From Swiss-Prot:
Oligomer and partners: PMT1 and PMT2 form a functional heterodimer. The complex interacts with endoplasmic reticulum proteins EMP24, ERV25, ERP1, ERP2, CDC48, HRD1, USA1, YOS9, ERO1, PDI1, UBR1, Cue4, DFM1 and TED1. Forms also a minor complex with PMT3.
Keyword Chaperone: no
Other facts: Present with 41500 molecules/cell in log phase SD medium.
Family according to the record: Belongs to the glycosyltransferase 39 family.
EC main group: transferase
Gene null: resulting phenotype: Affects glycosylation of chitinase and increases sensitivity to calcofluor white and caffeine.
Originating organism: Saccharomyces cerevisiae (strain ATCC 204508 / S288c)
GO MF: dolichyl-phosphate-mannose-protein mannosyltransferase activity
Physiological role: Protein O-mannosyltransferase involved in O-glycosylation which is essential for cell wall rigidity. Forms a heterodimeric complex with PMT2 and more rarely with PMT3 to transfer mannose from Dol-P-mannose to Ser or Thr residues on proteins. The PMT1-PMT2 complex participates in oxidative protein folding, ER-associated protein degradation (ERAD), as well as ER export. Required for incorporation of proteins in the cell wall.
Catalytic activity: a di-trans,poly-cis-dolichyl beta-D-mannosyl phosphate + L-seryl-[protein] = 3-O-(alpha-D-mannosyl)-L-seryl-[protein] + a di-trans,poly-cis-dolichyl phosphate + H(+); a di-trans,poly-cis-dolichyl beta-D-mannosyl phosphate + L-threonyl-[protein] = 3-O-(alpha-D-mannosyl)-L-threonyl-[protein] + a di-trans,poly-cis-dolichyl phosphate + H(+)
UniProt domain MIR: residue ranges: 324-378, 388-448, 459-514
Protein name: Dolichyl-phosphate-mannose--protein mannosyltransferase 1
InterPro entries, A to Z: GlyclTrfase_39-like, Glyco_trans_39/83, MIR_dom_sf, MIR_motif, PMT_4TMC
Amino acid sequence: MSEEKTYKRVEQDDPVPELDIKQGPVRPFIVTDPSAELASLRTMVTLKEKLLVACLAVFTAVIRLHGLAWPDSVVFDEVHFGGFASQYIRGTYFMDVHPPLAKMLYAGVASLGGFQGDFDFENIGDSFPSTTPYVLMRFFSASLGALTVILMYMTLRYSGVRMWVALMSAICFAVENSYVTISRYILLDAPLMFFIAAAVYSFKKYEMYPANSLNAYKSLLATGIALGMASSSKWVGLFTVTWVGLLCIWRLWFMIGDLTKSSKSIFKVAFAKLAFLLGVPFALYLVFFYIHFQSLTLDGDGASFFSPEFRSTLKNNKIPQNVVADVGIGSIISLRHLSTMGGYLHSHSHNYPAGSEQQQSTLYPHMDANNDWLLELYNAPGESLTTFQNLTDGTKVRLFHTVTRCRLHSHDHKPPVSESSDWQKEVSCYGYSGFDGDANDDWVVEIDKKNSAPGVAQERVIALDTKFRLRHAMTGCYLFSHEVKLPAWGFEQQEVTCASSGRHDLTLWYVENNSNPLLPEDTKRISYKPASFISKFIESHKKMWHINKNLVEPHVYESQPTSWPFLLRGISYWGENNRNVYLLGNAIVWWAVTAFIGIFGLIVITELFSWQLGKPILKDSKVVNFHVQVIHYLLGFAVHYAPSFLMQRQMFLHHYLPAYYFGILALGHALDIIVSYVFRSKRQMGYAVVITFLAASVYFFKSFSPIIYGTPWTQELCQKSQWLSGWDYNCNTYFSSLEEYKNQTLTKRESQPAATSTVEEITIEGDGPSYEDLMNEDGKKIFKDTEGNELDPEVVKKMLEEEGANILKVEKRAVLE
């Protein structure tokens, strides 16, 4: 029997060929390689289409590039990402929960614009100085936003949508208010969405070619590069990697059933996909982090999140070096907690307000004299030693606080904050001059050999290298700390308790600073070993993950994932001079996507029941392609949306936008099936439906454009636009009429210069100025300790009143508020 070819020629504007189904020895099978003609049907080969795409590009550019210079002050998260660009240019290390690529791109653009990092983007509403190329940085973001629209058009064409429908779908995306808003400012969302769109586009392009062809491999490589760049901008890109991986498994499954494919060719394709779609993204991810570490070489406040080994790779760090190695009785030491960022075992002359009401023992993250402890033998406290005695495993000691002259102490009292925990006891500092202490001051050193450096550090305590536990001799509990903060009375320092259970690593300590008068000057010294690239890479990811999951503080504009598909509320980005910028989606497109997802789900369920009842299913090529492509895109929607329900951190509407992009792609196919199948005998009617939908989308965009561009509006128009109560932009800020704006004088709020700018320093001798005098002066006050760490004014007041602290220096900056 001769083999009959089922593929048939189609019109250029109808790019969905028939499925190529062949009869095998036992069953029919689908030929997975597309027709050689498919690529020509779905790519721009006509002058008309090229001109249409050019017009689309111009239209999109006008929308996104319009008025980028306004607002001329910091908007929303430009506070963070503009500030990070400044840090890159200055080379000062900072901490962020996102990978570095998008931030580095902004820094590169700013550097090309001559930016010296002399503006910190400190507060929303701070006016940009003339030295900050913020328009250029926003232009970069807007350009990526415009290119994303073109990528959507090309993606729809590659997945089988006819030219005119793809064009109108892309225009709907171009006027989607939320995407316009995020692409006009210095935010991570525009680069992220561009890279995700590029990955989707490249993978859909790959599907047009035979699996082992050169064009297919080129498209796979492009997909891998885009996935790497998306993942290197925000971890959301990993969801896109997952989506591509699921589609690869889908296609490989059908390839296994394709009798025209040999096992060798299938393995070759599988290996290529692993290399291009996992290997390339991971390699790029590593490269971008390497550049990140190489660019940020100076120690700064952001580096305080990291280990001493990490910080020792940075210039101007304050990490102790050349520490005396041997620790013994009579040594004055500082004890550092291993597993939290809490810092050093600390005490100060403030008591607990409840419990024993004895002196507080805490963790303090900065170097300070109140971190110093003298090691004493438990049965000879205060005894003068004549020979050096090493601190070994099993030694029973007491820790004498050198500043307040009391000893580390535990007893049967509830801890100050974790009072509901029956496995933790209070740790205090107890004693007074002339008092030798009691048995509740006794602690037994237990060296943790597994976590200590190999060799002598496992036998006796060596500074930095030996990790050990301190067991309370009376109760058997261990000196413990965890990420629980004391209230204001404890200066928000980290709680220290004595734990009879809990995580082992939270009971581990090590000696950082160490001195002993009985050791000779030439005694062996030790320093932190600078972290390798891999160590820094791993540690930075642990910190990113930890900080990200702990972003749980309530926010006035946060929203829950369940509300996102219904656009119940937006986010205020900026508000000044009787104008607002507010993130809100285009309700016409937004709700259409949500409705279509529900309708498509019902259609699929109905079809499955019909098929189960033995009724024939539709085999029309357009319907088949519609189902396949929509399932692909809704799978992308689900992969990007579902993880939001597992996250316990703050969530905002813009977290929905990657999933929403896939929803709009699926909606594009819904519009196409209306034209190509629902109204197949009256296509003009189908096009009329699509044009009506487009017109409604454009109208919504135009009506709500004042909160995109931060332009004048009236109270009446604003109030009429608030369709839902959650659309809570402030209409009272607007004037009653547009005429009033013509007579308005715009005000500017200048910001403080960056930390590197010149300041007038005045050193104050003696006790310095009083807190009250300083607070009564005009201007913003920033208090810092001697290590440069910013302090809360109320904490400063308490320190001045109760600890005898002094104000040593006043830095005066010329600031216009």
